[in-house]
Amino acid sequence: MDKNSRYTVDSSILFRQWLNDTREMVQDTIFHSRIQKKNNNHLVSQRVFFEQNAHSHYFSYRNNKNLFKENPVSYIRHQSLYNVLKNLKKGRYNPDISIDLHGLTQHQAQQALGELITTCQKEKIFCAHIMHGHGKHILKKQTPFWLSQHPDIIAFHEAPKFFGSDAAIIVIIEINSLKKNINIFN
C-alpha cells in the first residue's frame, strides 16, 4: 500500500465511525412555490395564446376580391389619417420590430401576424416591418388583405428599397394608449 491510499482508507473509516451515532433528518417542509409558478406560467401562456388567436381571428375572412391589385400596395383605415400614409410612403417611419413570413403556410402566417400585433401593443411599438417575400405570390397577395381586415391596423405601405421593396410591407399599428390621441403621427 502506498502512502496516499492508506490515508484515504483511514480517513473513510474515521468518517464512518464519526457518523455512526447520527440519524437522518426528516424533511418536513413542503414547498408550494414551484407548483404556483407552474400554474401561473400556464395561465399567462394560455392568456397570451388566446390574445394572439383573437388577433389572428380577424384574418380568417376569405372573400378577397383582389382589392390590392395596384402596385405599390398601400392601405389607410380612414381618410382623416392620410398624413400617416403620406409619411409612411416617404419613409419617415422606421420599424422597431420585424417579422419574416418566408416559408410559412397561410395559417402559420396568420398566427405570426397575430403574435406581431399582440407584441406591438404590449411593447407599445407602433411601426412594424413584415417580410412576405416573393415566392409564389401567395403570401404577397394575402398579407395586405389580412392586414386591411384588422381593426388595429392604421395604415400600411410597400416597404422602401432598404427594407425589402415589394417583398415587404411597413405597417402602422394602433396602440391602446394612442387611440385617444391619433394625431401623434402628424
Curated annotation (Swiss-Prot):
Q: Which domain of life is it from?
A: Bacteria
EC number assigned by the record: 3.1.-.-
For the Smr domain, which residue ranges apply? 99-174
Q: Which InterPro entries match?
A: Smr_dom, Smr_dom_sf, SmrB-like
Q: Which GO terms describe its molecular function?
A: RNA endonuclease activity; rRNA binding
Supply the Gene3D superfamilies for this chain.
3.30.1370.110
Write down the PROSITE patterns for this protein, in alphabetical order: SMR
- Provide the alphabetized UniProt keywords: Endonuclease, Hydrolase, Nuclease, RNA-binding, rRNA-binding
Q: Which SMART domains match?
A: SMR
According to its UniProt entry, the protein's GO biological process terms are: rescue of stalled ribosome
Q: Which family does it belong to?
A: Belongs to the SmrB family.
Q: What subunit structure does UniProt give?
A: Associates with collided ribosomes, but not with correctly translating polysomes.
NCBIfam families recorded? PRK04946.1
The function of this protein is: Acts as a ribosome collision sensor. Detects stalled/collided disomes (pairs of ribosomes where the leading ribosome is stalled and a second ribosome has collided with it) and endonucleolytically cleaves mRNA at the 5' boundary of the stalled ribosome. Stalled/collided disomes form a new interface (primarily via the 30S subunits) that binds SmrB. Cleaved mRNA becomes available for tmRNA ligation, leading to ribosomal subunit dissociation and rescue of stalled ribosomes.
Name-wise, this protein is: Ribosome rescue factor SmrB
Q: Please give the organism.
A: Buchnera aphidicola subsp. Acyrthosiphon pisum (strain Tuc7)
